[in-house]
A protein has these predicted regions:
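Bacterial N-terminal signal peptides
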Residues: 8-20
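Short glycine-rich, acidic/polar surface loops and turns
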Residues: 312-315
Length: 369
């Protein structure tokens, strides 16, 4: 049994650290130094047949020269409910092949099936046990009411493990081993009817931490999407909420799906869906626990504005010399399609790409001078 003292030590809010985090954040920034003007993966791409509503969220990582995309495919009706979690691969970032379906949701729209909708597949490698883990969200689903948003509610985080040992097992097949986080007696007041809507684990020292998210979807209009931290001694848990410091003070109203990257100096950066127009959000941390106020990274400008809404970044992929590849999903902007739920257009989701550079703040302005 984990003692209260150990929990407090793992999640303690050291007073001087937020000041140090803020100081570090002011010294660094992410800059887009190459924009790809068209989406690189759409419902019209090879291998995407039968994917009615496109792609949303997930993670891309690079392993021995191959890019691996784990994403949510919105394959049918009900929209945002009938889903597949898929694995795609690419050697050049631009041309993709679908490798497999990892899991498929039931599409049940009665509110009874806890796996009616599946979202946000996040592959994480357990170095100690030499196995890939796949964390993803499973929701109950039902028609919305004037008061409640029920399309995706009571999210639970499932953990699956690859049956193939070692890094070569990244493609699975994956076998479910259980739920690691859900709304219940251990929840905090800021957690709402949506349940746990995202989960991303990362290593800090000899412990694991994870961002997890939620929203009070029991009352429309929905005012807040927030994230907080949980920690565990091992990747397989048990996962314990950092209630003393939750929710994270990164964004005022909307933050979803943070994905963390460890930088060369041992500090941390996370990218996330922020609702920023034509962009995504990012935040820095010195210790992986205390995070700076978020900033916007604009990923679509000029002729490259193909999305009506830029949605979810899929993680920063180090390419060397402080350059990162950043894939993201967004809804393609089709003329004549009005926004519906939460001002989002039900147009096909696609994947875009930018190259990003980590710089000292103001470096470009100084170079111009």
């Amino acid at each position: 049994v984990t003692s209260p003292r150990r929990i407090a030590v793992a999640c303690v809010a050291i007073l001087w650290l937020p000041l140090q985090v803020a100081a570090q954040s002011e010294k660094l920034e992410l800059i887009v130094n190459k924009q790809f003007d068209e989406p690189i993966l759409t419902i019209h791409s090879p291998d995407a047949e039968g994917n009615k509503y496109g792609f949303e969220g997930g993670r891309v990582l690079k392993l021995k020269g191959t890019y691996h995309l784990f994403t949510s495919e919105m394959v049918g009706d009900p929209h945002w409910v009938k889903m597949k979690l898929a694995h795609w691969t690419s050697f050049d970032r631009l041309h993709w092949e679908r490798a497999s379906t990892l899991f498929e949701s039931s599409g049940d729209f009665t509110g009874k099936d806890p796996r009616a909708a599946l979202w946000s597949p996040m592959p994480i490698y357990d170095q100690m046990k030499e196995h890939w883990n796949l964390f993803y969200v499973a929701y109950q689903s039902a028609p919305d009411t004037p008061r409640k948003w029920l399309t995706n509610h009571e999210g639970r985080i499932w953990r699956a493990v690859s049956k193939v040992k070692g890094q070569v097992g990244i493609g699975g097949p994956y076998e479910d081993v259980g739920i690691v986080l859900q709304r219940g007696k251990d929840s905090d007041p800021w957690e709402g009817l949506q349940g746990t809507d995202s989960f991303f684990p990362y290593k800090v020292g000899n412990k694991w931490y994870a961002f997890y998210g939620t929203a009070h979807t029991e009352m429309q209009p929905i005012s807040l999407w927030q994230v907080g931290l949980a920690w565990a001694p091992n990747l397989d848990g048990p996962w314990i909420r950092c209630s003393q410091i939750n929710p994270a003070n990164i964004e005022r109203a909307f933050i979803e799906n943070p994905i963390v990257t460890v930088l060369a100096d041992g500090s941390y950066v996370a990218v996330y869906d922020s609702g920023a127009e034509h962009g995504v959000g990012y935040t820095f941390s010195v210790d992986g626990i205390h995070w700076s106020p978020g900033r916007a990274l604009i990923v679509q400008k000029g002729n490259g504005m193909w999305a009506s809404e830029v949605r979810t970044p899929l993680g920063l992929i180090p390419e060397g010399k402080d350059i990162f590849t950043l894939f993201y999903t967004g809804n393609q902007d089709l003329l004549g399609v009005p926004p519906v739920a939460h001002e989002i257009k039900f147009t096909p989701g696609a994947m875009g790409l930018v190259e990003v550079k980590l710089e000292k703040a103001g470096a470009k302005d100084r170079d111009r001078r």
